[in-house]
């Protein structure tokens, strides 16, 4: 009976190959222990005026406890769609619900801690925020420059996600400015 309860509470994740194709499923615990390649969502929460919502991870997190995160998000569960995962994570971690999410594509990140295919999203929110106590200890607003100045305090994967979001946003803004206006 105890074993059944343990299995029922196990979080299962898709394991993917270098092409982001599902090749297996494993427990989250096994994925972390063996540094298996998986999927995660990264959500840049911003105020629409240049500030990014930054989270401090709790000391009990299984991945980089106590560090700052430039994005909300987390591991995609087995068989879960990416946007569904992003919405779930934003609501669980911060209480963000009912706001539009912009999709910014996929990226790959690998370091000594993880191997992950990231799905990048963003949303505008001004709070109030309801923090998930076992994952997020506090939040604050920082500019990208302030984040860069404190980069050693941040999870490396969230910094990559933020940098990609900034680059992709700059390209979108440039394309909009170059687009000739229609005349009647």
Curated annotation (Swiss-Prot):
Residues 36-164 form the Nudix hydrolase domain. Its cofactor is Mg(2+). A motif (Nudix box) lies at residues 73-95. CDD domains: NUDIX_Hydrolase (cd04697). Keywords: Hydrolase, Magnesium, Metal-binding. Pfam families: NUDIX (PF00293). Its EC number is 3.6.-.-. GO terms for molecular function: hydrolase activity, acting on acid anhydrides; metal ion binding. InterPro entries: NUDIX_hydrolase-like_dom_sf, NUDIX_hydrolase_dom, NUDIX_hydrolase_YfcD_pred. Mg(2+) binds at residues 89, 93. Signal peptide: none annotated. The keyword Magnesium applies. NCBIfam families: PRK15393.1. Belongs to the Nudix hydrolase family. This is Uncharacterized Nudix hydrolase YfcD. It comes from Salmonella typhimurium (strain LT2 / SGSC1412 / ATCC 700720).
